[in-house]
A protein has these predicted regions:
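Juxtamembrane "stalk/linker" segments
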Residues: 1-37, 45
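Short, well-ordered turn and helix-capping elements at secondary-structure junctions
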Residues: 20, 39-41, 78, 150
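A generic local secondary-structure boundary/capping motif
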Residues: 22-25, 93-95, 134-135
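Structural motif
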Residues: 33, 71-72, 104, 143-145
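Soluble extracytoplasmic domains of inner/organellar membrane proteins
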Residues: 41-43, 49-132
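Extracytoplasmic/luminal low-complexity segments enriched in Pro/Gly and acidic/polar residues
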Residues: 113-161
Length: 161
């Protein structure tokens, strides 16, 4: 009976820890993928308007999630289900924090799926490198740390009558 109770407590503790990781409340470490996106040359200048108009960061995040990415940050801004990627003037905001190029995307996830993803041709990453004046660099990395969110989402609920 006591052993059963300890197992249930352990199971609940694991679920809580997993939830904290997914929500971005704790740092995560693991293997994954590093992606760097920048203008091909300095003459192009600020690419924020261009990147936002074409929803490039949003499309990359979605494709990464489908291909094994579990935890993602862009320029050290941790993403979770409440994160927003939006244009604000001449820069992009993530989690209401302005970020600038180059866009460094860190991904932790299934290393085999992520490796297969970057080795495939005709991925979205390939297309932005070919179709836009952007330089895309990718690298598989064994030791990646993605820090917890600096601003924890405060959920507010509307009270009913």
């Amino acid at each position: 009976e006591n052993l059963k109770s300890k197992n249930q407590d352990s199971k609940v503790a694991n679920q809580i820890n997993t939830l904290k990781e997914v929500l971005g409340y704790v740092d995560v470490k693991g293997s994954g993928l590093l992606i760097k996106i920048d203008a091909i040359n300095d003459e192009i200048g600020n690419i924020a308007n261009f990147v936002d108009y074409n929803k490039i960061l949003l499309n990359i995040v979605n494709e990464i999630k489908v291909n094994g990415g579990e935890y993602i940050s862009i320029n050290n801004q941790r993403l979770n289900q409440y994160s927003e990627i939006s244009l604000a003037g001449s820069h992009i905001n993530i989690n209401s924090t302005p970020i600038a190029q180059p866009y460094n995307i860190n991904v932790i996830g299934d290393i085999d799926e992520l490796t297969d993803y970057i080795n495939k041709k005709n991925t979205y990453l390939d297309s932005i490198g070919k179709n836009y004046q952007l330089k895309v660099e990718t690298k598989i990395e064994k030791n990646i740390t993605i820090e917890k969110m600096s601003i924890i989402n405060k959920l507010e609920y509307i009270e009913g009558e």
